[in-house]
Amino acid sequence: RCVCTRGFC
């Protein structure tokens, strides 16, 4: 899955 963290996916 895609998890967007710290400004990126």
Curated annotation (Swiss-Prot):
Alphabetical UniProt keywords: Antibiotic, Antimicrobial, Defensin, Disulfide bond, Fungicide
Post-translational modification: Forms a cyclic peptide with subunit A (PhTD-3) or with subunit B (PhTD-1). An additional intersubunit disulfide bond is formed.
Biological processes annotated in GO: defense response to bacterium; defense response to fungus; killing of cells of another organism
Cyclopeptide (Cys-Arg) (interchain with R-1 in subunit A) crosslink location in chain: C9
Sequence position, cross-link Cyclopeptide (Cys-Arg) (interchain with R-1 in subunit B): C9
Ubl conjugation recorded as keyword: no
Sequence position, cross-link Cyclopeptide (Arg-Cys) (interchain with C-9 in subunit B): R1
Disulfide cysteine pairs (residue numbers): C4-C9
Cyclopeptide (Arg-Cys) (interchain with C-9 in subunit A), cross-linked positions: R1
Subunit (UniProt): PhTD-1 is a cyclic heterodimer composed of subunits A and B; disulfide-linked. PhTD-3 is a cyclic homodimer composed of two subunits A; disulfide-linked.
Biological role: PhTD-1 and PhTD-3 have antimicrobial activity. In low salt conditions PhTD-1 has antibacterial activity against the Gram-negative bacterium E.coli ML35p (MIC=1.5 uM), the Gram-positive bacteria L.monocytogenes EGD (MIC=1.6 uM) and methicillin-resistant S.aureus ATCC 33591 (MIC=2.5 uM), and the fungus C.albicans 820 (MIC=1.6 uM). At high physiological salt concentrations the antimicrobial activity of PhTD-1 decreases slightly: E.coli ML35p (MIC=2.0 uM), L.monocytogenes EGD (MIC=1.7 uM), S.aureus ATCC 33591 (MIC=3.6 uM), and C.albicans 820 (MIC=6.5 uM).
Family the entry assigns: Belongs to the alpha-defensin family. Theta subfamily.
Name listed for the protein in its UniProt record: Theta defensin subunit A
Species the sequence originates in: Papio hamadryas (Hamadryas baboon)
